[in-house]
Curated annotation (Swiss-Prot):
A zinc finger (RING-type) spans 41-82. The gene is SCAF11. It comes from the Eukaryota. PANTHER family: PROTEIN SCAF11. This is Protein SCAF11. There is a cross-link at K676 (Glycyl lysine isopeptide (Lys-Gly) (interchain with G-Cter in SUMO1)). Plays a role in pre-mRNA alternative splicing by regulating spliceosome assembly. PROSITE patterns: ZF_RING_1, ZF_RING_2. The modification Phosphothreonine is found at T331, T410, T769, T807, T1153.
Length: 1463
């Protein structure tokens, strides 16, 4: 590592690192002086032969003299065994050993090490934060200067005026960039220090040393290191919040470190600060932390956030976005600066170093926590990003709340305000924190004083009134947060500040909207209230802006505040509870105040609708000029902020490990509050948002677009998930927000626990967050224009997101592709260190679209205008609704949890997420499948095929995005080359075999399948359509000949040539040709397996090729595809495609087209396969009754028919769902893989057999028989040829059942095999076809065989069924089978005593078992309750006993009632 690091740093460091790396563990060197040619210097790894060799005096490890000497300079100990040495013996053949004294440069080395380690970290950060770095670069110059100063200060432990001046000069020269970078850098330093500090005091000291040394390094290469540091800072600020929150930094260390920070930061204002290191350190620390957060945001927001002086002008220059950005940055810096000034001026003077020292420690801790808290709030604010998005303009007001000039800037550009908002809130937070820190220093009751001051300010002045409301709300929120924080004054203050900040920001947002000036005013007021010297600067701003803004602001603010109050009231209420729990006097006082506010807020909440209207109106009036949208944003901001605050409280509470329990309670409460607040705020925001939305959208759009450019949008990619969410953006947005908030809370907790992770997480999240705002406007606009057009950004360009395609794709997304993608991403996210990234992404998702719209939607959703959305929100909470959304949400939630949880838990949760995702997808697919099946059943014309195609096409559109790849791939594999396909198929069969082995993996295959399925569907629909157009009717009319000839034509007679060929290369060729024929062969094969599912039907020889595929392939497929089929079944639309593929597109189309004809054809042909399959599918789609009759008629097995009816529907559902979820994999395997694998697997054994049988039957019997024999031979090579056909039919039927039912098929299978299903199947089969004989006899063998395959299928199915439970049918069938088995066991177990006691006869025993099993299996609960079974059995026994005695009625009633119970 060090070597790498060194390499990154510089050659010198590199060498040192090499030595260090050697030191760290180059144990490869030989221990003896004797070395061979192979021996290499452990340090340089060069051969020793050609170099001067030496060894340390204390050991015999051989090194290059140059290396060891250099090493000794760094560290005079053997790199290998660490033995210290003072001299190195140089070995020379002439002179022997020459002792060479070593020059020591331990200090240098140590510094280098520190520097290297620091730089390494920086490098990592730099690499990861390349985006931020650009912005950070701005700070770098100042950072380097500050770093140098900090280093100097640290070394001298003095605040050097020179250093300060130097910094000041630097600031002046590079006011914006330098200050900003410096602040962030310092924050980063502090973050580093704090991270370590939070872990241990020593760590902090070490970090201090590192910082100091690092500063030296910075001096060496200021810019580079500054950049790295900035990057590092970007990382560490994130980490810092958690660390700061932890606030475990020993105060002595903290004071030491903080002074450096303070010296660095304050220097910007006061080169020499009278403030004690501790106090100033604390302030600085809090500030640094705040600034760090701020800096991160600033980074994203602007490169010149730190020029405090310059920011004013830029703020005034609000007109230009950049100037606004700079102004914001400057304003933020200025705000920061003023807090620093305050700290140095007011606090330092007021509180004197000594007195401040103590408060400093607590304060610094508090501030540290506050900073983290602030960060938590920021996290909260990330949901607030939604706010920010909503408040793009509000963001500006928010910023303005941070700084008056910022307000102006906000007015100038909501976009920059949003960015600034992040920064400024941080700045405000830092300022407030600093101010509050000072206040804290001034009195333990600083919170009270702050609140009181705020309240007083409210009382004192209208200006203060506005601020007062801001303050009150902030106080409330802070107080609320405070209780949550468990009375850490710093934290509470921070929360309070955050709350105030949020409130002020909200108010200021409006104010800034109304009057940019005023925004700064409330903040200033707060700052002034806090007794900050900053008030001078801010006061100037305030004074300038106050008058104009004040009246309007008061109105808007008060109203805005009220809405804010509502959430805050909830918050305060909960917080109050927390406060009570925490038993903090200050908290209680705040609580009281809050309670009052809460009462008002409660009233406001009650009045919220009115307030919304009035607010909307008033705000419109007030903010008309500024921007109504800011107000909406403000509301959103307030809402988010409340949530944020809640999250912050939660996070902060979590941060306060001492108050973990409280924080947990707070989290729960806060989550509830968040929900409540969100709802209330949503409602309010909804009304408010609706008005300003139009205005806001443009501004937000512009702002965010600008932000987008200014920010690193690399992070925006996460929106891909968002795009998915955007489909359900309305319903999902809020849930996402809630989930996000929850996640944020979790994340903050996680961050607390993961001090190291937070920095990167936060940085990423921040970037994402910033990206989100930028995205959200675009998304909003896109949504306005094209709800999902933006998705094109996030999704592969292959998919052009048109509204039309969008719907299918939307569905598709719900289907596996996007959910999987999302799941994968989410899982990745959850795996990724940053929960925040995920939550940020989740937020993005929720907010990606117009935050306002989202909020409005969310509100509407919350208002349950859309039960679905509400449900979705609930599902987010209950995970009961839309599986997709829920899944994505759940993933989001679980991911934060996962992050919190152990890796195993992560993987488990991820897998659970995936499963739930799949379940959701399957459910949706199932729904679609049902719809599709209904539509199919409704029409049996080519249009029906088209319907399927459309179902497919639905997938096709989806697939079109994916299918092209697959198609290309398939084309390469051999769409046009059967052999090529053969190759592919070989792989596929292998894959399929693996699938067979891993039926469990079927899910994964299915996951893969979706692509293939897409392709499959795409292809299938196309060629199905072609076939339908080309002559499905003829084929249908002469299904055998047409299909056979068609398939053979398509397959080049591959199927027709010989089953051996078909099953052998021929079979592959068929498939390949089918593919060549647009997948006919493939579909044949896929259909073959489908037909095989329908192979019960599948005496469909019409597809002689199909039969080939169907036969052998189908058989294999049946086994392998049992699960596969399940997948396909889930994909109904895929199923049609597959069916068409299997049967031949035309035959399938024909059957679909001519259901009656097909039925007739089936009955005429007796080839239940072709006719039944199409008839089956159609019938299934049309009616289970028809399906039953047709299937019974067409199916060789009643079981096949019955199951096909039910099964097929389930299959359809399952296949559709699975195909939806897994359409690609399904298609892949259905095409080559699924079919191939089964064929390959089955073919291998059956292959030999059924080539014979198929050939024999093929020749002897029409294709129908060939298909049957083929399937039979494939599926049941063991059975004799005659039985195989029937057997195959049976087997196919049962196995198709298995496939169709996959879980169920097994049951149907097994049941067939067992008795009930089998009996119907054979019965139907004989009735249906002469083949029934075979099925009966063969049914047993095939049945048993199918059992085996079904067992595998069942296993896979079971797993799939877990995911597929959504496909009630397939899971039902599977469940049925399981239930039957279990029921049989239970019944036998229960009846055994009676039988042993001779209470019943053997016949009665059998009858009771049969009836009881049947009853249990048909119970509504679908579960086998041993108690109920026992009761049922007992009832039956009694029934029979009494029947003998003539009291049959009573007995019958009893079982009935028992059965009811069971049911």
């Amino acid at each position: 590592m060090k070597k790498k690091t060194v390499c990154t740093l510089n050659m010198g460091d590199k060498k040192y690192e090499d030595m260090e790396g050697e030191e760290n563990g180059d144990n490869t060197i030989s221990t003896g002086l004797l070395y061979s040619e192979a021996d290499r210097c452990p340090i340089c790894l060069n051969c020793l032969l050609e170099k001067e060799v030496g060894f340390p005096e204390s050991c015999n490890h051989v090194f290059c003299m140059t290396c060891i000497l250099k090493w000794a300079e760094t560290l005079a100990s053997c790199p290998i065994d660490r033995k210290p040495f003072q001299a190195v013996f140089k070995f020379s053949a002439l002179e022997g050993y020459v002792k060479v004294q070593v020059k020591k440069q331990l200090r240098e080395t140590k510094d280098k090490k520190n520097e290297n380690s620091f730089e390494k970290q920086v490098s990592c950060h730099e690499n990861s934060k390349s985006c931020i770095r650009r912005k950070a670069i701005v700070r770098e110059d100042l950072l380097s200067a500050k770093v140098c100063d900090l280093k100097w200060i640290h070394r001298n432990s003095l605040y050097s005026e020179t250093g300060g001046k130097k910094n000041a000069a630097i600031k002046i020269n590079k006011p914006q960039r330098s200050n900003w970078s410096t602040n962030q850098c310092f924050r980063n330093f502090f973050s580093n220090m704090f991270s370590s500090v939070s872990h241990s005091g020593e760590s902090s000291f070490t970090y201090r040393a590192y910082c100091t040394e690092f500063i030296e390094a910075s001096e060496i290469s200021a810019l580079i290191r500054q950049k790295r540091h900035e990057l590092e800072l970007s990382w560490f600020p994130d980490t810092l919040p958690g660390i700061g929150r932890i606030g475990f930094i020993p105060w002595n260390v903290e004071t030491e470190v903080l002074p450096l920070i303070s010296s660095v930061l304050p220097r910007t204002i006061f080169p020499t600060s009278t403030i004690s290191f501790e106090h100033f350190g604390t302030s600085c620390k809090g500030y640094a932390l705040a600034h760090t957060q701020e800096g991160e945001e600033k980074k994203q927001t602007s490169g010149t956030s730190n020029t405090r002086g310059s920011r004013r002008k830029p703020a005034m220059t609000t007109p230009t976005r950049r100037s606004t950005r700079n102004t914001r940055a400057e304003t933020a810096s200025q705000s920061q600066r003023s807090p620093i000034s305050d700290n140095s001026g007011c606090d330092a003077p007021g509180n004197s170093n000594p007195s401040l020292s103590v408060p400093s420690s607590a304060e610094s801790e508090k501030q540290t926590r506050q900073a983290p808290k602030r960060k938590s709030v920021r996290r909260g604010r990330k949901p607030p990003l939604l706010k920010k998005k909503l408040r793009s303009s509000v963001a500006a007001p928010e910023k303005s709340s941070s700084n008056d000039s910022v307000d102006e800037e906000t007015a100038e550009s909501d976009t920059s305000p949003v960015l600034e908002k992040e920064h400024q809130p941080d700045v405000d937070s830092s300022n407030i924190c600093t101010v509050q820190t000072h206040v804290e220093n001034q009195s333990a009751n600083c919170l009270k004083s702050c609140n009181e001051q705020i309240e007083e300010s409210e009382k004192h002045t209208a200006n203060y009134d506005t601020e007062e409301r801001v303050g009150s709300s902030s106080s409330e929120s802070c107080a609320q947060d405070l209780p949550v924080l468990v009375g850490e004054e710093g934290e509470v203050k921070k929360l309070e500040n955050t709350g105030i900040e949020a409130n002020v920001l909200c108010l200021e947002s409006e104010i800034s909207e109304n009057i940019l000036e005023k925004g700064g005013d409330p903040l200033e007021k707060q700052d002034q209230i806090s007794g900050l010297s900053q008030s001078e600067v801010k006061t100037d701003v305030c004074t300038v802006h106050l008058p104009n803004d004040f009246p309007t602001c008061l109105t808007s603010e008060s109203k805005v505040y009220q809405p804010v109050s509502c959430p805050l009231s909830d918050l305060s209420e909960n917080v109050e509870s927390v406060v009570n729990e925490e038993k903090i006097t200050e908290s209680s006082l705040v609580e009281i105040t809050e309670h009052k506010d809460f009462t008002l807020k409660t009233e406001e909440l009650i009045e919220s609708p009115k307030l919304e209207s009035s607010e909307g109106e008033i705000i419109q009036t007030v903010d008309r000029q500024s921007v109504k949208s800011p107000e909406v944003q403000l509301l959103g901001h307030v809402e988010t902020e409340d949530v944020e605050i809640i999250a912050t409280c939660d996070t902060f509470g979590n941060e306060d490990f001492n108050n973990i329990q409280d924080s947990e309670n707070n989290l729960l409460k806060n989550n509830l509050l968040n929900t409540k607040l969100e709802k209330s705020l949503e409602e309010k925001n909804e009304s408010l948002t609706e008005h300003p939305r139009s205005t806001e959208l443009p501004k937000t759009h512009i702002e965010q677009i600008q932000k987008h450019f200014s920010e690193d949008n690399n992070e925006m990619i996460p929106m891909e998930c968002d795009s998915f969410c955007s489909d359900q953006n309305e319903s999902e947005v809020e849930p996402s927000v809630n989930a996000d908030l929850k996640q944020m809370n979790e994340n903050s907790v996680t961050h607390c626990s993961e001090n190291n992770m937070p920095s990167s997480d936060l940085a990423d999240e921040k970037v994402e967050t910033v990206s989100q705002p930028s995205e959200s406007p675009k998304d909003t606009i896109d949504k306005t224009k094209k709800p999902r057009t933006r998705r094109s950004r996030f999704h592969s360009p292959s998919t052009t997101w048109s509204p039309n395609k969008d719907t299918p794709q939307e569905k598709k997304r719900p289907q596996s592709p996007s959910p999987r993608r999302e799941t994968g991403k989410e899982s990745r996210k959850s795996q990724s260190p940053s929960p925040k990234n995920e939550s940020a992404r989740g937020r993005k998702k929720s907010r990606s679209q117009s935050p306002k719209k989202d909020i409005a939607r969310e509100r509407r959703q919350s208002q349950s205008r859309s039960p679905k959305r509400d449900t979705t929100r609930e599902s987010r909470r209950s995970e009961s609704l839309s599986p997709r959304r829920e899944t994505s949400r759940e993933n989001k939630r679980s991911q934060p949890r996962v992050k919190d949880s152990s890796p195993g838990e992560k993987s488990r949760s991820q897998s659970r997420e995936r499963e739930s995702d799949r379940d959701g997808q399957r459910r949706e697919r199932e729904r679609r499948t049902r719809k599709w099946s209904r539509s199919r059943s409704h029409s049996r014309s080519p249009s029906r095929c088209r319907t399927k195609s459309k179902s497919s096409s639905f997938g096709r559109i989806d697939r079109d995005s994916y299918s092209p790849r697959w198609k290309g791939r398939w084309a390469n594999d051999g769409w046009r080359c059967p052999r090529g396909n053969d190759r592919y198929r070989k792989n596929d069969p292998e894959k399929q075999n693996e699938n067979t082995r891993k039926e469990k993996n079927d899910i994964h295959l299915d996951a893969d399948d979706p692509n293939s399925a897409d392709k499959h569907r795409n292809d299938c629909p196309n060629w199905i359509t072609e076939k339908i157009n080309s002559g499905p009717d003829p084929r249908t009319r002469n299904p055998e000949k047409l299909k056979e000839s068609h398939w053979e034509e398509n397959r080049n007679e591959n199927s027709g040539n010989s089953w051996n060929k078909n099953f052998g290369s021929g079979w592959v060729s068929n498939r390949g040709r089918g593919r060549g024929n647009r997948g006919r062969g493939t579909y044949r094969s896929s259909f073959a397996y489908k037909d095989q599912n329908e192979n019960r039907w599948q005496n469909r020889k019409p597809l002689s090729g199909n039969s080939n595929s169907s036969g052998s392939e189908s058989f294999k497929f049946v086994e392998q595809q049992s699960y596969k089929r399940k997948s396909e079944q889930e994909f109904s639309f895929d199923t049609p495609a597959d069916r068409s593929g299997w049967t031949s597109a035309s035959s399938w189309a024909v059957r679909k087209t001519l259901p009656a004809d097909v039925q007739n054809y089936y009955s005429r042909r007796g080839r239940n396969s072709s006719g039944p399959q199409s008839g089956w599918m159609k019938q299934e789609e049309e009616t289970s009754g028809q399906d039953s009759s047709l299937k019974d008629q067409t199916n060789q097995q009643v079981d096949g028919s019955q199951l096909p009816i039910n099964m097929m529907q389930p299959q359809m559902n399952v296949m559709q769902q699975q195909m939806n979820a897994q359409h690609q994999p399904m298609n892949i395997f259905p095409y080559p893989v699924g079919v191939h694998a089964p064929l390959m697997n089955i073919q291998r054994n059956p292959f030999n057999i059924h080539p014979q049988l198929p050939l024999h039957l093929h020749t002897g019997v029409p294709l129908m028989q060939v298909a049957t024999p083929t399937s039979v031979s494939q599926g049941l090579p063991p059975p004799p040829p005659p039985p195989p056909p029937s057997q195959q039919v049976n087997y196919i039927a049962s196995q198709p059942d298995g496939k169709q039912l996959q879980g169920i098929p097994s049951s149907s299978h097994v049941s067939n095999n067992m008795s009930t299903p089998v009996l119907p199947a054979p019965t139907a089969a004989p009735g249906n076809t002469g083949m029934v004989q075979g099925p009966s006899s063969g049914n047993t063998s095939s049945s048993s065989h199918s059992k085996a395959s079904n067992a595998a299928v069942k296993l896979a199915e079971s797993k799939v069924s877990v995911a597929v439970e959504a496909s009630a049918d397939s899971s039902k069938t599977d469940k049925k089978l399981q239930i039957q088995e279990k029921a049989a066991q239970e019944v036998k177990l229960a009846i055994k005593p009676f039988y042993q006691n001779k209470d019943i006869t053997k016949e009665e025993y059998k009858e009771i078992v049969r009836k009881a099993v049947d009853k249990v299996c048909h119970s509504k609960s679908g579960e086998v309750n041993s108690t109920k079974v026992a009761n049922l059995v007992k009832a039956y026994v009694d029934k029979y006993k009494y029947s003998r005695k003539g009291s049959q009625k009573k007995t019958l009633e009893e079982p009935v009632s028992t059965e009811k119970n069971i049911g």
